[in-house]
């Protein structure tokens, strides 16, 4: 039936959770999925994508979300911004496109934290602990 169950690799009108992602690698993975030409796709969040055109749109949406996030973090890190400033910088690019989507406000702090880490050279995601969670919120609320 040519159906892909992508899990959180692809979202449909929902924020991507990237707190433990490899952001630089994600677009290549989306390229591989695109090349498979699925007729239907079940995303991690959002409605099932029931036509090839809807699948293409879901893949493009996810690529845009992840690329906008990571590019913004790379720009911020290149300018020496801390996590709080990176969040503000990233919101300028992300909010106009994604602020209205499901779980955006919930995911964004974790997404920006991971993007800032990866853009700073932290290749492998750090484990989320209660302490790390508190540190993140403290940094973001400065």
Positions of the model-derived regions?
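Catalytic core of the metallo-beta-lactamase
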Residues: 1-28, 32
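Alpha-helix C-capping/helix-to-loop hinge sites
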Residues: 13, 72-76, 93, 97
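Short, well-ordered beta-strand elements within core beta-sheets of diverse protein domains
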Residues: 14-18, 75, 116
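Alpha-helix capping and helix-loop boundary segments enriched in small/acidic/polar residues
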Residues: 17, 57-61, 103
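Divalent-metal (often Zn2+) His-rich catalytic cores of metallo-beta-lactamase-fold enzymes
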Residues: 27-85, 89
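C-terminal regulatory/interaction regions
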Residues: 79-142
């Amino acid at each position: 039936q040519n159906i892909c169950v992508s899990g959180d690799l692809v979202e449909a009108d929902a924020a991507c959770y990237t707190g433990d992602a490899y952001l630089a690698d994600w677009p290549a993975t989306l390229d591989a999925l695109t090349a498979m030409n699925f007729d239907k796709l079940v995303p991690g969040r959002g409605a099932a994508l029931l036509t090839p055109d809807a699948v293409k749109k879901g893949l493009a949406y996810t690529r845009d979300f992840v690329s906008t996030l990571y590019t913004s973090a790379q720009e911020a890190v290149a300018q020496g911004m801390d996590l709080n400033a990176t969040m503000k910088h990233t919101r300028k690019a992300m909010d106009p496109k994604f602020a209205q989507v499901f779980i955006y406000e919930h995911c964004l702090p974790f997404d920006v934290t991971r993007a800032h880490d990866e853009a700073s050279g932290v290749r492998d995601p750090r484990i989320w602990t209660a302490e790390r969670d508190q540190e993140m919120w403290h940094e973001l609320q400065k």
